[in-house]
């Protein structure tokens, strides 16, 4: 996994969300968008805290970035899966692709278990 590319993708989504809220006339909410992965730290199950411009509800955004195509596989942590389950109505996965060329994105809303085929690829071993 390329951490630098991931951080660039997160920054892209922070700017995108602020811009979306400004266009909706919600300067107040745009100022509240928080890059939690940087400001608070990893481990919350999402990277960006944003808001719905209509009802002001929180949007918990996990960002997955690739320089490759739309369907290139991505990795998620158990914490991200749990967050998507526990906070399904607020959880959004932004899949940023073609980053470095013309970045584009699609959004999956709700449970990752319901939106994706999840395949275990890492196991913890104890003796």
Give the location of each predicted region.
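Protein C-terminal end segments and domain termini
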Residues: 103-127
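Acidic-basic catalytic patches of nuclease active cores, encompassing PD-(D/E)XK
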Residues: 1-32
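Extended, charge-rich C-terminal regions with high alpha-helical propensity
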Residues: 44-46, 56-61, 124-127
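Conserved catalytic cores of phosphodiester-cleaving nucleases, focusing on short active-site segments
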Residues: 13, 17, 48-50, 59-67
